[in-house]
Amino acid sequence: MFAIPFTASQVYSHLGLYLQPIEKLDPLTKVQYESAEKLRDIIAQLSRRSGGISLRKNLIRDIACGHKPKLNIPSLTHQVRHNREFKHGRSQFILVDSNGSDYYDGIFDDMVLILQSNFVLPNVPGIISEQLRLIVIDNDFYLKHIPSEIAILRDVLSEHMVKFSIDGVSLEDPFISKFFRKPFVLYDHTKFKKIDLTKVVLINKTGKSKAQVIDKYKLNDDAVFINYEVFDVMLQPTKRRDGDIEQFIRMRGDIETWKAKIGTTFEDNLLELFVHGVPVMNSTSQLQLDFQISDIRVASVFDDQIVCASKLNSLREQCLTESSLIRVNIIGQKGSGKSMLMKLINERGIPGISRRIICIDSDAYGKWRTQTQYIDNKFEALKLINVDNLYEIARDDSVVSFYEQFIIDQLLSHNIEISEHTNSLRFIKQLKVDILKDIGRKFKEMYLADFKEQGQFYEYLCGNMPEPSNTLLITFLHATVETSAAPGTNMNFSLNTILYPLQSILNRKRGTLVNFILNRIYDEMGTEAFTRLRPCDVWK
C-alpha cells in the first residue's frame, strides 16, 4: 500500500510518476492494489472514530499481516472478563495470551467493521508477500504529503522505502515498476541547427546577464554560453533563462583547473569536457543546443556510477587473475563519442589495468567488407583481419564502410544523390518518413543476412590475436544486436557521454545525411541495454 493514495496524482506527477491504468495491471498486481485500497478505506473509517487512529495501531498491524483481529484477555477489565453474555458473543475476537490489541472503548465495534469489510490479504507463497507493506518514497516532498492517519502507522507497519536520488525516483524499484508508467526523454531533430563551436564559450556559473559576461570577457555578441560548475556532490542542472541558449555541465575535478578555462571555447576544451563532464538525463544539460520533441528514449535513473564502478573493478580483477584474452564490448550511437573515447584509451590507458589494450573501431568490420568485397581468395581476405590493418582503415576516411555504401545505394534508389544540398540541415529536416522506414527495413534485412560473416570476422580476429594472455580487446559497436556476433564476453557497456549523438552528426563536415540515417536505424536496433559507461567514471 503506497503511503499516499494514487488519487493524489499531483504528488506523483511532481516526482515524475504517472500511474498505469488499473485495468492494465497484471492480475497479481491488481489483486494487491485492490487489497491495499480496501485496507486504506478501513484505516480511513477507523481514524474517524473516537480516540483516532493511535488507539488502533496494533489492530491495523494485525490485519495488515493477514491475522484476524484479536484482543488480549489480560487487558480486559474484571467486569468484562466475567460477563458471560459478552464472552459467548465475542469469543471469536478473544485469544488468551495473544499478540492482539489491548482493550479500549469501541474496540469490538472496530473488529466488527473489519470483519464485515471482507478484507482478505492475498497470499501466494513465493509470489505475493504474506503481509501488506507500506510503500514510502524517500523524498521530503512526498513525506510531507503523507496523510496523518497513515503517517502514524509507519512505526507498526512493515515499510518499504523507495530510493530517491538526484535523478529522481528509482525506476528499478519493484513497486514503482509495477504500478507506474516507464518515463521517456523526448528529443526533436526538426529544431536542430548546426553550431559554430568556436562561438560556444565556457563561463563559470554566474548571475551576470549575457551583456555583462560578453563585456567582461570581451566576447562577440553572438557568443553561446555553456555554464559549468565544479562539484563534489551531484547537483541539479539549471534551466534555460531569458530565451538565451544557455547550457549547464556538471564537472568533476579541481576547481582551480576549470577557473583557468573561463572565457575559452568549448571546441578548445572538448576532450577535457568529454572526460570530466557528467551526463544527465535532462535535455537542457546535454550539449545539443536547440531542439524540441520527436526522438524518444527510455530514461534510466538507476545509479549508474555504482553499477559501472563495480563492473570496472571486476574487469580490473579479471585482467590481474586471468591468463587469456580479456574482451570488452562498448556500444554507442553514431555520434556518441566512441572515436573520442577510443583516442583517450589509446593515449591514457585505463586506470588500474596494466595489460596491452587494443581497440577495434566500430566501423572496422564495415570497412573490411568494403576492402575485401572484390577479393575472390577468402584466405587473402582473412589475412587482412589484423590489428594493424583494421587500425589503418578505420582512420582512412577515403574507405567507405560497406554499411554506409548500402545507405548511399538505397538513397539513389529513391533518386537522392549525396551532395552539399542533401547533406544540409534543411534537406534532412524535410526527409520523408516513408523513405527512412523503407531504407531502415532493407538495411535490417541486409544486416541479418550478413550476421554470420560478421561473427566469423570477430572469431578470426580473436583467434589470431598476438599475445592474447596479456591483451585486453575492446570492441566498439553501433547497436546492442551486434554483441551476438562480436567477441563473446559478459563485459558489455553502453556508452553514455555529455554529447548528444544527433547534434554531433549534424556538426560533422562529411557524410551528414548517411550518418543521420544510420543513427536512426541503430537507435531502433537498440543501444542502451547494458551498464552505462561514462568517461567521468573511468578517469576520475
From Swiss-Prot:
The keyword Transmembrane does not apply. Keywords: Capsid protein, Host cytoplasm, Host cytoskeleton, Inner capsid protein, Virion. Its main location: virion. It is found in: Virion; Host cytoplasm, Host cytoskeleton. One of its GO terms (cellular component) is host cytoskeleton. Interacts with VP2. Minor inner capsid component. Displays NTPase and RNA 5'-triphosphatase (RTPase) activities. May function as a cofactor of polymerase VP2. Associates with microtubules and plays a role in the formation, structural organization and morphology of viral inclusions, where the assembly of cores and the replication of viral RNA occur. This is Microtubule-associated protein VP6. The gene is S6.
